[in-house]
């Protein structure tokens, strides 16, 4: 949407009413053959469906390429938007209910997950553990020959308000999204 709207600072409800936007979205999505309930399902569908391209997270492009390469098939080329990325950062949260034992367990888990060893293991799965590149030790996972840019500094887009996000999702679900392939 940002690109179709000329890269505003942030998408607003008013910008969703821009003349011609609906037609541009329809044209853009006309090339979508299948949609999926999750990014991992989409990767699996791509690997079994004989499709030519996939829009997905960097880590799932890497995962798909690892499988394609193991099967001796042509790998995907990663393409990054030049004007900003939507980043899935999966934060870890804790609700303090006054239980010191549970809080300590949470803090221990957090310390473990943030340890160099575990951060390295996470990076080995093709997931970045920070905004500024990857460790030299994991350069073989983030492969330039697949178009992966390990030294790219991630520049996130500014997310719209919750209300505007809900409006965007509603529009997508009701006006633009092709039905899922459902088999009973």
Question: Where is each model-derived feature located?
Answer:
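Extracellular/periplasmic juxtamembrane helices and adjacent flexible linkers that interface
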Residues: 97-182
């Amino acid at each position: 949407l940002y690109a179709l709207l000329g890269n505003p600072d942030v998408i607003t409800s008013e910008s969703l009413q821009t003349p011609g936007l609906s037609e541009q979205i329809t044209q853009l999505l006309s090339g979508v053959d299948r949609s999926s309930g999750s990014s991992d399902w989409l990767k699996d569908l791509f690997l079994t469906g004989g499709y030519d391209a996939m829009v997905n997270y960097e880590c799932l492009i890497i995962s798909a390429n690892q499988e394609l390469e193991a099967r001796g098939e042509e790998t995907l080329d990663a393409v990054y938007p030049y004007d900003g990325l939507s980043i899935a950062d999966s934060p870890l949260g804790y609700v303090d209910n006054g239980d010191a034992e549970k809080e300590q367990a949470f803090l221990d888990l957090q310390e473990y997950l943030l340890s160099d060893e575990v951060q390295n293991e996470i990076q080995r799965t093709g997931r970045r553990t920070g905004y500024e590149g990857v460790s030299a030790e994991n350069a073989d996972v983030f492969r330039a020959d697949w178009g992966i840019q390990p030294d790219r500094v991630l520049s996130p887009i500014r997310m719209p308000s919750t209300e505007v996000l809900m409006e965007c999702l509603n529009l997508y679900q009701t006006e633009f999204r092709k039905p899922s392939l459902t088999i009973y």
